[in-house]
Amino acid sequence: MSSIVNRASSASLPNFLAWRALGFRTICSGRLGFAPSVPDSPVSAGTKILESFKEEFEVGSRVVSFETGKIARFANGSVVLGMDETKVLSTVTCAKTDSPRDFLPLTVDYQEKQYAQGLIPNTYMRREGAPKERELLCGRLIDRPIRPLFPTGFYHEVQIMASVLSSDGKQDPDILAANASSAALMLSDVPWGGPIGVIRIGRICGQFVVNPTMDELSSSDLNLIYACTRDKTMMIDVQSREISEKDLAAALRLAHPEAVKYLDPQIRLAEKAGKQKKEYKLSMLSDKTLEKVADLAATRIESVFTDPSYGKFERGEALDNIGKDVRKVFEEEGDQESLSILPKAVDTVRKKVVRSRMISDGFRVDGRHVDEVRPIYCESHYLPALHGSALFSRGDTQVLCTVTLGAPAEAQSLDSLVGPPKKRFMLHYSFPPYCTNEVGKRGGLNRREVGHGTLAEKALLAVLPPEEAFPYTIRINSEVMSSDGSTSMASVCGGSMALMDAGIPLRAHVAGVSVGLITDVDPSSGEIKDYRIVTDILGLEDHLGDMDFKIAGTRDGVTAIQLDIKPAGIPLDIVCESLENAREARLQILDHMERNINSPRGQDGAYSPRLATLKYSNDSLRTLIGPMGVLKRKIEVETGARLSIDNGTLTIVAKNQDVMEKAQEQVDFIIGRELVVGGVYKGTVSSIKEYGAFVEFPGGQQGLLHMSELSHEPVSKVSDVLDIGQCITTMCIETDVRGNIKLSRKALLPKPKRKPASDAGKDPVMKESSTVYIENSSVGEIVASMPSIVTPLQKSRLSVPAVVIRTAVECNEAEKSSPVNDNDKPRRAATSKPDRKPKSTASKLIATQKEEEALESIAPEETSAECGEILKQDGKLKSVSPKNNSTASNLVSFSKAKKSTMKENLSENKAEESASVSTRKLKIGTEMTATVDHVRALGLVLDLGGEIRGMYIFQGDKDKFKKGDTLRVKCTSFNTKGVPVMALVDEEGEE
């Protein structure tokens, strides 16, 4: 402390407030003299400075850089490749010793960690888990062009690990990882015949784009990945939207020189920082051993391959017997060195025999020509209980494809650095051991299965309807039943048929075929002297050949391609020639598929799976989900359906129509339906007002049914038509911004018949649909004017005052059509004030019936032509000329026609009135017989008669009832909406 005081005098020390203002960081930083600065120490002798090497170049208007020496220095070879803000590290390591094997144990691991885009993994442990599908696919993408360039007989274990260090989301890191792996192999001491260049080509609006960004790829109809050496093609991977073979060949020829731009920077970097290649022991076959095996087995092998009657397993068994006989000979001679490589030697002899016969004769092991397709059998709708299914066979290769539709929320979530966040179409390829008659284990993700499934998925993705038109999640399962080559292309064919069988509107069928290559190479120069392109290869031809070129597409173009080769590259001209051979074979396969099913199949039967999409508001969906999702899970458990909610849409997936109806019924019971203008809905009358009635729908929604919308006829009182608790069907005619719903009942009723065109010439006063008002004082004049047709008894009947009711519209029409002046209108006979209480419908009809009886007393047979038409003029009635004498006849015919109609109306109104009266008089304790109208999830809807509905709540006896059952019930209470609640009554009258 004393030293501090000596170094800082009292004059220079600030006061307490100044200390606080300066802060701890300022004090300890040495600004006040407490912490003297320490000069940078020079680099001591012997300290190794990190030395890095870098190569930069430009490809497709973007700067690419290779860098080594800064990180991962202990690896046999390590390179960081950068493009924009995306950087990928690739490392190579190799085992020092090899183990006895006859293949190259090359492992390629590609990894994307979330730190590369500044995120923490959204997992429970917040760590990256097992490799994802995309990581496996990128590993295969790196492996396929690299593997053929290792020397023959090099069986040391090699591991390549590619890791994404940072990603800006603009470029897909897979291409960068492949080029970085090539550069890392060039820097290592591992013998390898590289380098290679890998490029991506897109096509936007007909123009090819080199190294397109992810945004550009979304609008591109081509995604081509091309790998090559300086003059040979190594690998092709294509996903496109029906691109023609001509345009695809043009894209390949453009990609080759662009990919070559990656080669020279790798060579320059290897010259600066590369290691000397080591001498590794190669497991080579001696010429002496090969000659001896050929002498013992070549003739017998050729006889097996030239016999087309052999099947796959018969041929394999015959070849195994030949190998066993050769082994016995070597064991008798005691040649242990040859015994260790004998399987490889026998396989080499097989390859020479098959290849030489196909090159010279053009025939294959099963007797086909090089361009011939195996027999095809296909069957759609193989499993009717599924959404879609198809069985496809080509030769001995057979696959079973099934389609399952799901809700949009069931789409697969993709946790990758680039690309879409979800995938709604999935094809899962499965290769079980029994398909090759082998014993094996079923594990997790298999790289081969993932790769084959993704290839078939890309082939079918181009013909699927857009998500806006078909938003459902689609899953295809491709189960290989038997395998003899090209199972992935068979999955494309079977998957296309299964999609059609599921009713999905595909744009066209997609078929796939594998094309192989057999070459005759000059040993001295390594150039190809002769070759044969083989269509629809067998599994044996895939093993013994040089190329497996899988091509899928429609009649209009290619949708997916995958090229794998075994030699160190093939010329691009041969690749382009293979495209035309594949197109011809593809058209043959499409013919077979279209003969079986050529359009989407419609739903058939009540047992086929169902899928429905319903739109609801967010508030309604929250009600459906319930607290912690209880209500949603309850519906799924009780009905067996699956409910999915996504962005205001409810999707219901059910096994059959019955399950779908049960699920929709429970959904409607909880949240009701979103009423749409023009929609017809059933509801219950909850309350009656003077101006109308309120109708309640499932879910608690209510709408107003105004009295003007009850019927086409005028309604003076709503209760005369409706009762509380009555179940009615209405149409939604209007909804406003506040959510108020207006309903109509008359919109569903038939409109009244209009006047026929034949009545246009009749007098408008005497319409059939109208009634004439007759004054009491004029009755005698009417009788006096018709002495020839009216008897004294009839006169007495006509003297009775008649009260006839007609509508205001009919009165107005009669007054407008009448020739009298407005001042000369006759007065009504009854001038007294009407009663305050309106008369009932029955009393009105009785008064009308009395008038009919008075008018009917005029016998129609006594009517003569001398009876003139009665018109009102100057307040008096007088007869007119017989030329227009249709008044009496019209009056009589009208009365007879009206009589039957009014009698029917009288009986109907009496029934309605009695029904409504009985409903209003329904009291607690009233017993009656009811019929089960509907069976709901929580109870029964009972028909009590007279269009009156009641309810019965289940008491653990849900399964005892069905629609149409007759029950004896008693009214126990009324709910808040006025609906009677009933209880069951047994035969002894007890509840």
From Swiss-Prot:
Repeat listed as a keyword: yes
Reactions it catalyzes: RNA(n+1) + phosphate = RNA(n) + a ribonucleoside 5'-diphosphate
EC number: 2.7.7.8
Name used for this protein in its record: Polyribonucleotide nucleotidyltransferase 2, mitochondrial
Domain KH residues, every copy: 609-667
Matching InterPro entries: ExoRNase_PH_dom1, ExoRNase_PH_dom2, ExoRNase_PH_dom2_sf, KH_dom_type_1_sf, NA-bd_OB-fold, PNPase, PNPase/RNase_PH_dom_sf, PNPase_PH_RNA-bd_bac/org-type
Biased composition (Basic and acidic residues): 822-838
Lineage, uppermost ranks: Eukaryota, Viridiplantae, Streptophyta, Embryophyta, Tracheophyta
Ranges where the record places region Disordered: 813-865
Cellular component terms (Gene Ontology): mitochondrion
Keyword field: Exonuclease, Hydrolase, Mitochondrion, mRNA processing, Nuclease, Nucleotidyltransferase, Repeat, RNA-binding, rRNA processing, Transferase, Transit peptide, tRNA processing
Function summary: Involved in the 3'-end maturation of mitochondrial mRNAs, rRNAs and tRNAs. Functions as a poly(A) mRNA 3'-5' degrading phosphorylase and is required for the degradation of highly expressed transcripts of non-coding regions.
PROSITE patterns with a match to the protein in the record: S1
HAMAP family noted in UniProt: PNPase
Matches recorded under SUPFAM superfamilies: Eukaryotic type KH-domain (KH-domain type I), Nucleic acid-binding proteins, Ribonuclease PH domain 2-like, Ribosomal protein S5 domain 2-like
Family label: Belongs to the polyribonucleotide nucleotidyltransferase family.
Gene (name only): PNP2
Subcellular location: Mitochondrion
Organelle targeting sequence: 1-39
